[in-house]
Amino acid sequence: MINPIYLILADFFDRYIGEPPEKVHPVIFIGKLIIFFENVFKSTNSINKSRDLLFGFFNVILVLAIVFFMAYEIEQVINSISNSYIRISLYSIILSFSIGHKSLIEFSKAPIRYIVNNDIDGAKKSVQCVVSRNTSELGKKHILSASIESASENITDSIIAPLIYVAIFGLPGAFLYRAVNTFDAMIGYKSEKYLYYGKTAAYLDDILNFIPSRIAGMLLIITAPFYGGKIKSAFYGFFKEGNKTPSPNSGYTMATIANSLNMGLEKIGCYKLGKGEITIEKALNSLKAVDYSVLLFLIIYTVLLM
C-alpha cells in the first residue's frame, strides 16, 4: 500500500490544476494504442465471432502489456530519486493524470449552466459530451438527469477506482485500470462493429469496477448529509435499486444519489432510478456528492495506514 500523501496530492493536483495537454496525456496515448492495434487486427467491418473475440482479446493484452511496462519503468525511475520532495511531487503529478476529478465536475456542470440560462440547445450539445444516448429530443428534466447520471457513474471510473488500484498496485495499477476503462469507452459498447471485438474489454471493465463501484456507493451513503441528502434514502437506493441498470456496476452510485436527493433519474426505455423532481439545486448537490465521497475515501485510507 502506498503512502496516502501520494493520493491526496494527486487528487489535489487534478482537482485544482487539471489534466495535462493532450499531446502528453497518458489516456490519449492509450487511446491511440487501442486504435493502432484495432487497425492491425480489425481491418474490415465484417463480423466474424471467433476472429473478433480472439483479436479483441489480443488488442487488450498487447495494450495492457505496453501500459504496464511503461508505468512500471516510470515508477522505478521516480522511486530512485533521493530527494523526497521531488520524488513525492513527481509521483503525485504523474498519478494525477489517471484521475478525472476536475473534468468530471466541469463536464457535468456545463449542461446545468445552460439550463440555468434557458439555453436548451446548448444544454443538449453539452450533455452529449458525457453520455452516449441521443440528446436531440431531450427536455430539461432528461438533460439534467443525464448530467447527474454521468457524474454519479463516473465517481467510480474517474476517481475512486484509480485511487484504489494505485493504493494497492502503485502507478501500474492506476494506469492499467485507466487503460481498461478507456478500452470500455472506445470498444466496449454493444454496437454491431464491436459486439464481439469489444467483449474482453467490456468484461474486464465490469470485473475491475465491481468492488470500487460498491465502495463508491457506500461512501455516498455515509456522506449524504454533507451534500444535502438523506442516509436512509441513500441506503435504500444502494440496496434496492443498485442492480436496476444494464451495467452490473453503474447503478449503485446512480441509485444512491438519486434516492438520497429524492429525485428521479431516467434513461428513456432503459431504466428509472429514484423518485422526485430534479431541480438545479439537486443537480448541483449531486456534484458536491462527488467531492465529499472522494474526501471521505482519502480520510479513511489515511487513517487505515496511520
Curated annotation (Swiss-Prot):
The chain crosses the membrane at residues 17-37, 54-74, 88-108, 155-175, 207-227, 286-306. One of its GO terms (cellular component) is plasma membrane. It is a multi-pass membrane protein. Belongs to the CobD/CbiB family. It comes from the Archaea. The gene is cobD. This is Probable cobalamin biosynthesis protein CobD. Keywords: Cell membrane, Cobalamin biosynthesis, Membrane, Transmembrane, Transmembrane helix. Pathway: Cofactor biosynthesis; adenosylcobalamin biosynthesis. Converts cobyric acid to cobinamide by the addition of aminopropanol on the F carboxylic group. NCBIfam families: cobal_cbiB. It is found in: Cell membrane. One of its GO terms (biological process) is cobalamin biosynthetic process. One of its GO terms (molecular function) is ABC-type vitamin B12 transporter activity.
